[in-house]
Structure formats: C-alpha cells, structure tokens
UniProtKB/Swiss-Prot annotation:
Family to which this protein belongs: Belongs to the G-protein coupled receptor 1 family.
Assembly and interaction partners: Interacts with RPGRIP1L. Interacts with RACK1; the interaction regulates TBXA2R cell surface expression.
Source organism of this protein record: Mus musculus (Mouse)
GO cellular component: acrosomal vesicle; nuclear speck; plasma membrane
Chain positions found as Phosphoserine: 328
Name under which the protein is recorded: Thromboxane A2 receptor
Length: 341
C-alpha cells in the first residue's frame, strides 16, 4: 500500500536511484531540446511533402508511404516526448502521479506502436519498390489510396501487438530512471514471449528491407546500363531508391542495437532480472542508451527525404544531374513527352 492508502499497480519494479542521480541523468533541457528537434524536423518534412507533385503511379504511392512514415514519427515524438519531458522537468515520482499505472500502460503501448511502425513501413516501402522495379508490368497500378491502406494496416498490426500486454501477454513497467515505460525484460514466460515477438518482428522488418533493397538496387543498376534504360525513366526511381536506402540505413543503425540487446537480455542465462523484478544497474544503463539511440530514427527519417531529393542532390553533386539528363535524353521522344519535366 502507498502511504495515502492507494495500492500500487503492477507496473512498478524496484529501481534504486537517488534524486541527485536522477537529476544528473534526466535533464529536462535535453529531453525538451530532443523533442523539439524531432518535431521541427518532421514538420519541415511534412511541409516539403505537402508541396511535392506526386503525379501518378509509383511516385504517388511512394510519397504516400513516406508521408505515413513521417506522420508516424511526428506523432510518436509528440506523444512519448511530452510524457518524458514533463517527468524530467518536474522530477515527479511515477508512483505518486500514476499509482494505477494507466499512464504507464498508455506509454508502453505508444512505445511499442511508434517503435514498430517505422520498421514495418520501411519494409512495406521496400516491398513496393522491389515489385515496381523488378516486375513493373506484372502488378496493378500503384495508387496513393492503396499506399494509405497499407499504412493503415501497419498501424493496426502495430497497435494490436502493443495491446498484448494489456491482454495478459507480457508486462509494461516503469524503467530507469523512472521517467518512461517499456516492455519488461523479465523472466516470466509472458515477458519473454512478448519481448521476443517485438524484437524478432522488428529485426525481420529490417532484414526484409535490406534484402529487397539490395535486389532492387542491383536490378536498377543493371537496367540503367542496358537497352531497357531507353524504355523506362530512371531518374525518379533512382531518387526513390536513394531515399529508401537512406531510411533503411538509419533504421538499421538506430534500432538493431536495441533489438539485439532485448533478445540477448531475455535469453541470457542466468537471468538478468532478479526474482524481485530488479535489473542490474549496468543493464538499466544499457537499455536507456539503446533506447535513446533508437529514438534518433524519428529525427533522422525526415532529413533523409529532405536532403536526398533530386533538387538537393543536383546542387550538391552536379554529376548526378548530368547523369539524370543523360538518361532523359536516352528515352524515346514519345515517352519523353509523356513523362513531362
């Protein structure tokens, strides 16, 4: 029982941390600046996307998926960042402000949802480009409506997975230094199963993106230097693949350390978590660091699109512009007229 007579929820674990240590780790300025940088970056990307001319076909589908990714990153930073920044600024004791764990459960669901969505959307974008490049004439015409339907399916799938701990599979708990909630790296079967589902699904999404993007880039390079280059405009596809590879690299660098750490911790023998639910301080520090690295994915994603557009690449690398012009000159006259500027 808590001193005011309120019983504590199941999201609390023993976490030994002093107020001075928490002040040193949980800097309100760092949290606020980090959140503001991410929100500003995603708002800038959304404004650029709003002014883009999607046209029709593969580009409209790709831009719709990209818009869904940036929108998801923006909402993720807005929801989770607001909770963490407020906890850091006020140095609140989670047990006093949320003894029933409702806010903790909400944040846990949000962390899983907004963590998996970018990885799943990256895999969906890689699949769309793989089919578009390797089999351009053997699929239905890509449309932005179908792309938004894909975004909706990803949101539903990630949301359903995030709700599993509320249905009894796994647990969400307050994490060191007491300002955020995430899945529990415990020894209970439900914790292990849910944690492995999250880590394996995220890793599989990254692996699928790597495989499909590698094949797509190889196919694009082969077609670029063959007769087929005179039959299909390559400049737009090159731009989309450069952006997609950048998104994949960012996701791999930011998320794989955390996903691998979760799997290693859950499968480690002897278990890292004690019977009382306490983690080793070194493990808590590592989890916090890997989580902060993973959060950079939401900040860097929009900059991949902003910096890797054709207009920017032409300014930074004139040779890229000359290569695109050479490809355009190699198109048949009728196709060049239909393709437009």
């Amino acid at each position: 029982m808590w001193p005011n007579g309120t019983s504590l929820g199941a999201c609390f674990r023993p976490v030994n941390i002093t107020l001075q240590e928490r002040r040193a780790i949980a800097s309100p300025w760092f949290a606020a600046s980090f959140c503001a940088l991410g929100l500003g970056s995603n708002l800038l990307a959304l404004s650029v996307l709003a002014g883009a001319r999607p046209g029709a076909g593969p580009r409209s589908s790709f831009l719709a998926l990209l818009c869904g990714l940036v929108l998801t990153d923006f909402l993720g930073l807005l929801v989770t960042g607001a909770i963490v920044a407020s906890q850091h600024a006020a140095l609140l004791d989670w047990r006093a402000t949320d003894p029933s764990c409702r806010l903790c459960y909400f944040m846990g669901v949000a962390m899983v949802f907004f963590g998996l969505c970018p990885l799943l959307l990256g895999a969906a974008m890689a699949s769309e480009r793989f089919v578009g490049i390797t089999r351009p004439f053997s699929r239905p015409t890509a449309t932005s409506r179908r792309a938004w339907a894909t975004v909706g399916l990803v949101w539903v799938a990630a949301g359903a997975l995030g709700l599993l701990p509320l249905l009894g599979l796994g647990r969400y708990s307050v994490q060191y230094p007491g300002s955020w909630c995430f899945l529990t790296l415990g020894t209970q079967r439900g914790d292990v199963v849910f944690g492995l589902i999250f880590a394996l699904l995220g890793s599989a999404s990254v692996g699928l993106s790597l495989l499909l993007n590698t094949v797509s880039v190889a196919t694009l390079c082969r077609v670029y230097h063959t007769r087929e280059a005179t039959q299909r405009p390559r400049d737009c596809e090159v731009e989309m693949m450069v952006q997609l590879v950048g998104i994949m690299v960012v996701a791999t660098v930011c998320w794989m350390p955390l996903l691998v750490f979760i799997m290693q911790t859950l499968l480690q023998t002897p278990p890292v978590m004690s019977f009382s639910g306490q983690l080793l301080r070194a493990t808590e520090h590592q989890l916090l660091i890997y989580l902060r690295v993973a959060t950079w994915n939401q900040i860097l994603d929009p900059w991949v699109y902003i910096l890797f557009r054709r207009s920017v690449l032409r300014r930074l690398h004139p040779r890229f512009s000359s290569q695109l012009q050479a490809v355009s000159l190699r198109r048949p006259p009728a196709q060049a007229m239909l393709s437009g500027p």
